[in-house]
Amino acid sequence: MSIILSEKSEQYLQKGMTSNFVVDIMFIEEPCTQIYNPTVERIKDVDLEKYKDYEKVSNQNLILYLSDWFIKIYGKLEEYHLDVSGILKKKLIITNIDPIIKNTCKIN
């Protein structure tokens, strides 16, 4: 497993001086729809202990901690492509997987 960084994400990481992120799932449920959206969130140094048992993927200056729920939904990927999203509030996103959208209504 490896991490591929876009040029923007490399710049973002250099500015933020942060190297630890958790990859998790944001679950959204609306009428007739369930959405599983992968998220990448910064981990504060004081919170690192909480993630010690998570599966890890790293390169020389970045560690991604994969939540059990992320692994259950998406599995372990060969590569994690990271880019930056957002206009005012920048954040990392995974670009090589899409949200899973499920239709939960039983329409006959």
What are these regions (language model features)?
Residues 1-108:
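Domain-level signature for proteins that mediate thiol-based redox and metal-cofactor handling
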